[in-house]
């Protein structure tokens, strides 16, 4: 019985790590593709990339804070599944937002800085917040299964950083070139749905 419990805990820890790694990778996939998506409307400049990096980091920070509070209030695996699924939905929705907002901003008299910020904020702030929730939420769940606090926190943050690195290089060097920007965003959303599913089915318990 104890062996079975240990095996389940080990599988849960592995899956939490996979989810943190992949969600962090997806966030950077969205960040890199954001530059490509808004380039036809505001170009590629210091202003556009400042907006992209700033907005996504702001969303990530807010998500980390919310995720920590949610975890302290008892957020469990179902909460993680909900967040991942919503992140997938809002990632798809970002493409629809661009379709509607582009004509409005193009016909406005907004300067480049304001337009860049509005594009990125309306498209990617919410997905960034949702993805930011994942790491503190799952790290807290992992700490309930392994008392080695430093080991678990360090591992999860390392996986998040590694996922971000892989997501950055994979998108910039390979994914966009071979699949196109919109398909990459759709693929990222699909990946989030796949990550969310086991949490609803409670496979990692």
What are the residue ranges of the model-derived segments?
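Alpha-helical transmembrane segments of multi-pass membrane proteins
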Residues: 1-205
């Amino acid at each position: 019985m104890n062996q079975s419990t240990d095996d389940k805990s080990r599988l849960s820890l592995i899956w939490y790590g996979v989810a943190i790694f992949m969600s962090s990778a997806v966030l950077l996939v969205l960040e890199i593709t954001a530059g490509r998506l808004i380039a036809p409307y505001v170009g590629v400049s210091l202003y556009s990339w400042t907006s992209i990096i700033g907005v996504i980091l702001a969303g990530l920070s807010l998500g980390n804070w919310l995720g920590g509070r949610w975890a302290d209030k008892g957020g469990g695996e179902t909460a993680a599944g909900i967040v991942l699924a919503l992140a997938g939905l809002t990632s798809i929705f970002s493409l629809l937002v661009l379709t509607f907002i582009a004509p409005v901003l193009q016909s406005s008299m907004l300067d480049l800085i304001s337009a860049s910020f509005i594009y990125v904020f309306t498209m990617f702030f919410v997905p960034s917040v949702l993805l930011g929730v994942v790491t503190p939420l799952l790290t807290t769940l992992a700490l309930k299964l392994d008392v080695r606090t430093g080991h678990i926190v360090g591992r999860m943050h390392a996986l998040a950083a590694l996922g971000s690195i892989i997501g950055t290089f994979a998108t910039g060097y390979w994914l966009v070139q071979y699949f196109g920007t919109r398909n990459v965003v759709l693929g990222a959303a699909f990946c989030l749905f796949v990550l969310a599913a086991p949490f609803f089915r409670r496979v990692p318990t």
